[in-house]
Amino acid sequence: MLDPAPRSPAKDLADSTSTQLLHDADGFSIATWKNVALHLWTVAATPEMVAKLDEFSLAFTRAHPEGISAIHVIAKGAPLPGKEVRDLLRDVSDRHAKHVACVCHVVEGSGFWASALQSFLTGLHWLSQRSYSLHICSDIAAAAQWVPGPHAQRTKVTLAPAELEQAIRFVRNRVD
């Protein structure tokens, strides 16, 4: 019996309307829902994680010529990345910016840590050459309400906030 033809990861990424978990290891998860990339960071980003993010981003943007959006959930207490990783993240952001409608960071928690992380994220994107909309919020519901507007404006793909929230929560609930 012949094995079925191998599936193209890019085709899988393009066809998915349910939440697809693509990577889940070492405190870093990558998932997709429609043409939205969903990321969960529960530990400090490492060069290896950024390489995985870059690899995935390349395939995902190729699978979605209409454009994509990205939501990054950063768990309470996840350490700020060091300089090497900050530079790598900036490079990835710059490399894929022309394909991105919007980026939303959900920074869980409050206080000094959350303020420091928000400042880091603002600086990361402020210094990059970006044409996408950027939003930083403190909860998943706020992200699910904000993303559909800039996403539809750029990609012409309509997202239902309640469905988007469910997809984000699926990824977030992987760890607790």
Feature map (PLM): residue ranges:
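Amphipathic, Lys/Arg-enriched alpha-helical "gate/interface" segment within cytosolic domains
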Residues: L2-D176
